[in-house]
């Protein structure tokens, strides 16, 4: 057998290092994830961490995590023992090391340790409320939408109970929410296909509610995630007004109260949620029609997530 020379070993080592680096690079460029287990995942909301981790909220209850470079959804916070009934919203607050969760039936805003998944608190909404999604202000105040009550509630840092932050007929069907700046909160209506601007006062409560003018129609808008000043991603489920799941980039001019809607990806099944990490916008198909709709009883898998580079 021929002995390996030092130069050959150096070349082989360099080749291996290159191969490993290429594999990591490839893993970081995953643009589609297909999840086959669990079959009752039915994701309704997604959030993410700066390192590329994606966290999914499952409607039947439970929180799942997909680590960077992986495609498998692993249980992070179990349904059992955590008071989950129906999970509609999840939001990672890395600054506060908190995962916020909207549970409904009853409506509650829940807080968990973002690293360990340990419960930190649970904050009840009024009877009949539907806690749907969450946004967090720069000062740490968490806002949660009540879709059934046409209201927003807030939980200030250190507070022990939710406080009503906004109530208005324009908020009927309120669902997703995202900050435009520290004094401006944008929300949508999943039932009325609207985008709405809320001006916030020093106490964090709404002082003015404005129906925005849209550059095009929306189709059951759902999850929203801020990605810049007066700029956010939005996921749409689709309806008679605009069919099919769609991911959009929305830019608002707060002076003219107009919203410019740019399609990033469409032609999907109903997409209830989006998130942004590492320059990519992720959107997920919820497949709720396989749970309670026309396809109930059929195999819903795979549950798919798609990534699009943010312009």
Can you say where each PLM-predicted feature lies in the sequence?
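Blade-level signature of beta-propeller repeat domains, shared across WD40, Kelch, NHL, RCC1
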Residues: 273, 279-311
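Structural motif
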Residues: 108, 153, 194-196, 242-248, ...
């Amino acid at each position: 057998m021929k002995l390996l020379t030092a130069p050959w070993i150096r070349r082989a080592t360099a080749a291996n290092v290159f191969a490993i680096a290429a594999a990591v690079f490839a893993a970081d460029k995953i643009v589609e994830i297909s999840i086959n287990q669990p079959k009752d995942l039915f994701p309704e909301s997604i959030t993410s961490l700066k390192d590329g981790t994606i966290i999914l909220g499952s409607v039947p209850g439970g929180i799942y995590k997909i680590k960077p470079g992986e495609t498998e959804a692993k249980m992070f916070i179990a349904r059992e023992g955590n008071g989950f009934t129906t999970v509609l919203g999840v939001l990672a607050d890395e600054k506060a090391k908190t995962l916020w969760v909207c549970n409904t039936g009853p409506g509650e805003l829940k807080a968990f340790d973002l690293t360990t998944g340990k419960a930190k608190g649970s904050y009840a909404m009024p009877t009949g409320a539907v806690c749907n999604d969450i946004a967090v202000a720069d000062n740490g105040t968490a806002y949660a939408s009540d879709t059934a009550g046409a209201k927003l509630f807030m939980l200030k840092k250190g507070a022990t109970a939710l406080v009503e932050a906004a109530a208005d007929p324009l908020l009927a069907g309120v669902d997703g929410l995202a900050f435009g700046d520290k004094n401006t909160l944008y929300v949508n209506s999943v039932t009325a296909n609207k985008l709405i601007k809320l001006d916030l006062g020093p106490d964090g409560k709404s002082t003015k509610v404005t129906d925005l003018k849209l550059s095009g129609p929306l189709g059951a808008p759902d999850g929203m995630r801020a990605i810049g000043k007066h700029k956010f991603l939005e996921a749409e489920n689709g309806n008679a007004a605009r069919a099919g799941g769609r991911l959009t980039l929305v830019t608002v001019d707060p002076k003219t109260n107009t919203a410019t809607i740019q399609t990033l990806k469409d032609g999907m099944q109903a997409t209830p949620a989006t998130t942004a990490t590492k320059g990519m916008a992720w959107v997920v198909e919820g497949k709720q029609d396989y749970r309670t709709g026309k396809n109930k009883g059929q195999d819903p898998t795979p549950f798919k997530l798609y990534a699009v580079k943010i312009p």
